[in-house]
Amino acid sequence: MAYQIFEMSDGQRVALYAQGNSVLYCLLPFARGMLPIEVKRDYLAHFEARVFRDTVCYVYENLEHTIILDTLGNGPARIILTDGPLGYGFCNLHLVVRDGDLYLFYQAFSGREKGYGLYVCMPYQENCRGV
């Protein structure tokens, strides 16, 4: 379990982390008696988060082996990647914010090709993927 701490534009700090099958967050400073808030219950692996447009965005692999992008408090989660019929596996998820856009870099293992490839997608833009 590794905490990721983010500071928002209003100065509020947020700690976000995965534990067991849960994704949790809490506002800082953390006072005695406060409990973290569970936002997801289907976490499996590969947790990564960034602040994008003053919102904490996070990505992870869920229990169904799909890659999910979600935000703290804003809108529904989005399925970004699925394993498909070829049996892909995903790892090394890395969110990057650059020039006002959000990018997801990841590696995918293809059972057919027996190797990893490096890919990038822009989760908030349709059909914007690259190798």
Enumerate the predicted regions with their spans.
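Extracellular, repeat-based ectodomains that mediate carbohydrate processing or recognition
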Residues: 1-131
